[in-house]
Amino acid sequence: MIAADTSILIYAHREEVPEHVSALAWLTRLAEDPLLWGLPVFCLGEFVRVVTHPRIFDPPTRLESALEALFGLLASPSLRVLNPGPRYPELFSQHLREADARGNLAFDAQIAAVCVEHRVTALLTADRDFARFAKLKWLSLSDAPT
């Protein structure tokens, strides 16, 4: 199962970013494919936080538009929201230690841990910091969707 992180959701949503077309193509492919794909639960709130933030986007996305985009993705029948399970605390601490994660990287460790717990085969991301987590394979937007 491929999972997508917040950066992909943001780029697919915001038309003015250079990565918009490729992120939208990836998300469309994932959402329409019958194969399971995942979104770490942490990315849902982070997406809303970023796209509605007036210091990040001018103008920011209206809350209702952000929620509409989010619920549009959640309607994909092949999507699984990846929630922490019983192994999550140990996996999270392992990922924190492995990457010596502090600050913002600690948030990425959460995503990596929940993906590993759900046996995600690759995380689609524009964030190269995920390379610090050896147990998690990642894909970039330049890796064409198949």
PLM region descriptions:
Residues 1, 112-113, 117-146:
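Acidic, PIN/NYN-like endoribonuclease modules and their adjacent C-terminal/linker elements
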Residues 1-39, 54-68, 146:
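Short, well-structured N-terminal submotif of metal-dependent ribonuclease cores
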Residues 5, 108, 127:
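Acidic active-site catalytic centers that drive phospho-/nucleotidyl reactions
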Residues 8, 43, 87-88, 111, ...:
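Alpha-helix capping/helix-boundary segments
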Residues 33-34, 76-77, 133:
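Structured helix-beta-strand junction loops
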Residues 36, 60, 79-122:
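Active-site neighborhoods of divalent-metal-dependent phosphate/nucleic-acid chemistry enzymes
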Residues 38-41, 125:
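Short beta-strand segments at enzyme active-site cores
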